[in-house]
Amino acid sequence: MATEIPVGRKVRVKVPGSSANLGPGFDSLGLALSIYDHVEVEVIDSGLEVEVTGEGQGEVPLDERHLVVRAIRAGLKKADVIARGLRVRCNNSIPQSRGLGSSAAAAVSGVVAANALAGDVLDTDTIIQLASTFEGHPDNVAASVLGSAVVSWTNIPVDGTEPTYHASPVTVHPDIRATALIPNSHASTEAVRRVLPSDIPHLDARFNVSRTGVLLVALSKDPSLLWEGTRDRMHQPFRAEVLPISSEWVNRLRNQGYPAFLSGAGPTVLVLSTEPVEEALLQEARDRGIRVEELTVAGPVTVEDA
């Protein structure tokens, strides 16, 4: 029989955003970034109260359809606990549908909050597994859970049972910084995936495998390899037609020597480097309505009793 969480129990979660793919590492590499959502969850007598401020305010549902709420419910069920009612407050800074892991952060915050309310009965692997079921891949989720960079993978059993999601952290060189150029437009991951071909030439697959290896060395040991390590032939060339502004800025930045790439499904463009991007370039981006954020590599999700 499930244990009931006492009314009045409250936890606060701080979850970082993330970038996925990082150029060649399609659906496998992720990086936590210092832009955060804050979620407070309190057990109340009955019902559900949802409040959202910041990013997504006035746009996301304030009922059981809210992703954080769905993730909380999944976490409580997995932990075998129940709550009479929930009050959920979300203060969001991660831009939504921009390729910075907002949906993964929501799923992670909900599962982590539920686990904290239950007394921390779920281990890290279970949290990644549970949160990744909302995404269908673990790259952003694992980055938000573990912090730093991650290598992630999915195993799909031949017997048709549910996929299992896995990740391992990668320590990032301390000199690496991130600059995000965030266009004022949304990108649906599903829509942007539709332009990808079902098959790619063996030569291009080999190219991406080698560059993924180079990128891991660049991230952990030798940042001078970041430009070479962020080259890609698997997904970004095909997404250029539906993300023309992003493609323009990726090409402009790379042509000037900056390791730029599409963050996740876009439209955000991310630069990873040890030196700042030239201010004149960033100002031009701002003048064209593109938001610029100077970020650092973030640590893992954190939680505390409120």
UniProtKB/Swiss-Prot annotation:
Key words of the record: Amino-acid biosynthesis, ATP-binding, Cytoplasm, Kinase, Nucleotide-binding, Threonine biosynthesis, Transferase
Any one of the GO BP annotations: threonine biosynthetic process
Class of the enzyme per the UniProt entry, highest EC level: transferase
Reaction catalysis annotation: L-homoserine + ATP = O-phospho-L-homoserine + ADP + H(+)
E.C. code: 2.7.1.39
Keyword DNA repair recorded: no
Molecular-function GO term, any one: homoserine kinase activity
Residues annotated for ATP binding in this entry: 95-105
Cellular location(s): Cytoplasm
Pathway: Amino-acid biosynthesis; L-threonine biosynthesis; L-threonine from L-aspartate: step 4/5
Superkingdom of source: Bacteria
GO cellular component, one term: cytoplasm
Family that this chain belongs to: Belongs to the GHMP kinase family. Homoserine kinase subfamily.
Its biological purpose: Catalyzes the ATP-dependent phosphorylation of L-homoserine to L-homoserine phosphate.
Name the UniProt record assigns to this protein: Homoserine kinase
Protein's organism: Corynebacterium urealyticum (strain ATCC 43042 / DSM 7109)
